[in-house]
Each structure stands twice: as C-alpha cells, then as structure tokens.
Amino acid sequence: MKHKKFDIVALFLLIGVFMAALDNGIISAALTTINQSFEISAQMGSWGITIYTLGMAVTTPIAGKLADMYGRKKIFIIEVILFGFGSLLVALSPNYTFFIIARLIQSFGGGGLFVIASSHIISTYTKEKQGSMLGGLGAMNGIASVLGPNIGSLLINVSGTWHWLFLINVPVAIMIVNFMMIKMPETQEKVKTKIDKYAIIVFSFSTLLMMFAINNIQTGNIANSILSFSVIGLFVLAMIGYGILILVEYKNEATDIDAFLPFYLLKKPAFSVVLIMGVLSGMLIGSIIFIPSFVENVLHVKAANSGYWMTPLALASGVGASMGGKIVDKKGTIFALVIASIISMIGYGGLAFLTYSTMPFLVFSIIAGLGFGFTIGAPMTVLATKSAHSAKNNSTVIGTLSVSRQVGITIAPTMFTTFIQFGYSQMGSKIKESLNSAHFGLKDIPVSLMNIMEHRSGNLTKILGQVNQISNDTLRRAITNGIEDATHLAYMPIFLTAVIASFIILLLVTLFRKEFK
C-alpha cells in the first residue's frame, strides 16, 4: 500500500539527508580556522572538502546496492552510525592526517543517505505524490549545502572553536538511529548480488588523478604547466581510467556482478544525458561553497559574518526545490528543468557580472537559489527513473545519478580554487594598470605593502589593512581599484562556469526532450 501523505519516517529521512549534506557547507565557513589550527596551507586544507565529496561519490552506489541486497532500513541505520562516529573522530582529530581519515569515514556514512531516502520515497509513495516528496528531499539537500556556512559561522562565533561543527552531529545521529530502529519498515523484496569492487577502485583512482591534474595547474605559468606530465599526463591517465571503467562494466554485463555504473543504463542515450546533467548540477553545488569567501573578499564582509550571507540563497533554494517538485507533478520534468535552467542562468550571470555591492548580491543570490533549488530537486531524479525504463531497481538508477552529481561536486572545488589562484596572481599587473591610469608607479607603493604582496605573506584582509593606512587618497584608491579588479577576476569564472553549466542543461533538455518522454 503506497502512501499519499507525508509521514514521520519521511521526516527522519529528511533530517538524515540534511545532516549529511550540511557537512560540506558547514566546513566552508571554518576552512580558514581549521587550516590555522593544523598550520596547513589553504590548498592542503581544501582536501577536507575534496576527500569528503570523493568518499560520498564512491559510497553512494554501494549503499544503494547494499540497501537492495540487505534492506533499506538496515543499511540506512548503519550509514547514520558511520556518519556519527566519523563526526566524533573529526572533532577529536589531533592532527591533519587523522582529520582527513576521519572525514573519509564520515563520508562513507553520509554517501548512502540520499539514495536510500529517494528509493524509499519512490517505493512507498504514489506517483502523484513522488514529485513533491522528492522535491522536499532535494530541498533538504540544497538548503543544507547553502545553509551550512550560516550554521558554521554561528557555531564558531558561539563556541569559539571549529570542533562543535562536527560534535553536533553525534546526538542527531543517535536520535535518528533510535527512531528508525522502531518506526522504519524494512524492504520486503531483497536482491542478492556481488559488489563491483574493481570498478569502484578504478573510478576512485581515476577521479583522484583528475583532481590532482587540476590542482597542479600553476596559475603563474598556465600554458607550460598544462603541457607538463603533472597536468596533461595525469589527465590522460584519468581518461584512460574512465575508459577502463566502461570496459569493466561492459564485461560485467554478462556476469552476476551488480555493476557500479550499470552498462545497460549507460547504453540508453537518454539516461547518459541525465548523467551529464548530474555532473553539471554537481558543479552548481560546488560553486555555492565559495559564496562566503566571495562576500568576504569582494563585498568586504567580516569573515565571521560571511556565512550569514548564504541565508537568502538557502531560503530561495528551499522554495525552488519545493516549487520544482510541484511543477514536475503538474507540468512534467522537461518544463521544470527548462524553467530551472533559465532562472539559474539569470542568477549566476548577475553574480558574475553585476555584483559590486550587497544589494545586487542579495537580488541575484535569491534568483540563483531559486534556479539551484529547482535543478537539484525532483526533476532530475524523476527524469532519471523515467529515462532508465527497464532499470532493475530504483536504488541503482538514483545511485548512478548521485555518482555523476558527486563527480561534479568533487571536481568543481579543485577547478574553482585554480580560478581564484589565477585571479589573485594577476593582482600585481592589475595594480600596476590602475596606478598608471592615476599617474603613479610601483615605486609609490609603501615598502611594507610591497613585501606582503610579493611574498604572499598575508591574506586579502591584511593587504587591505595596509592599503587603508596610505595617506594619499588618490594613491589609496588606485591600489584598491587594482585589488578589486583582481578579486573580481578571481571569482567571476566560478559563477560564469555555473551559467555555462545551466545553459548546457537547458540545451540537453531541449535537444533530447523526445527521448525523455
């Protein structure tokens, strides 16, 4: 008997999904604090996010398959326990190596929550209600991603330490486990299969190579660094790895192994297109991580308050996800994704080109949030299950879509960090251009400020602090203009990439609309 109304089990599924998705957003507000705590560079610190998203990408399909084999209730509870235990280890980390290992354990727990919750909804709710319910699930996922920095900033301000960002997960996990053990029904039909361990290893290794390749691009010498083995060589090896992955899955089709990326799904053009859209939607999520640093460095908001500026986008994404689910129920997935893509392009386009003060930022972040929520909510999940047609089970389909999305989330921060580094590497030339237009030269810059900029011994706040001490108003304004030009150059490509991703989603939906019906 399928449900028509929202029930208490669905509520706790939403809480579990929210808890896991919150973690990547919550850490973005504390990255600087964590890096200082372990005395590591910002580039090294980004692995705290990267390893978590990679772990989730690998775990998502495995958890979905284990849920089909042993039951959704059992695997969901194990996932929550793993996540809570990992959170405790992260909070107690004595060094950065331990921190990274703990984050990986945490990701193994968080990776299966969304796919199991989605599968539960599709299996237990009527078709008329599935769009709204999946929209609510997408809303939790989206709101958590963008609300995380808010909560992170609040907890750091209240507690004075980053450890509580992770300790707070422990009692929530205990509550979910206790409730689900009593109330959540177990899957009635279970499928016994073998886990595709070789494909998982190849996928993980290839994705790591891709991330290292992007990370090795030298912002001061892009052309030569791209041609080096550490970039182009690793990229080629990653592509070979993905090719081997497809070959492995092709061979697995004739066996009883439950494929990591099922070849019978990859053979369906419509489903392959949905996977591409999944990667692109993951990149949209990845762009949100950099909003706090954007408002801090571009809009000059205090670091402690930067996470709060995610609130409008967070609320808008929740509204967008909910609306997206209802539109799917009434107008269909194609119409919903077309609207989502157009709204996203307008919002992210405004953030890229028109955001020079707080008011335009608020307006365009709300628009971007609406489109973002629409996109990651119900439309893609419903489209994936429809385009798969003969899929053996919903968990496999949703799990495969989640893998593609996690690939986008995993690679995007590494790519966007490279954009930021390139933008800031142009600071010297931008300042020089600004000084020349104001009839000044580099010789007019105070020695103390030149030392900070040349040796990168300070962050942007420290540099601006030195600039504000310059008594000559014209000189101070010229230097500030150069710094602001470099800062915009650092962040504009992030939002421009989101615009391009949204446009490609719109293009794919339009071109393949007949195949999706």
Where does each model-flagged region fall?
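Interfacial helix-cap and linker-helix signal at transmembrane-aqueous boundaries
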Residues: 34-35, 66-67, 151-160, 214, ...
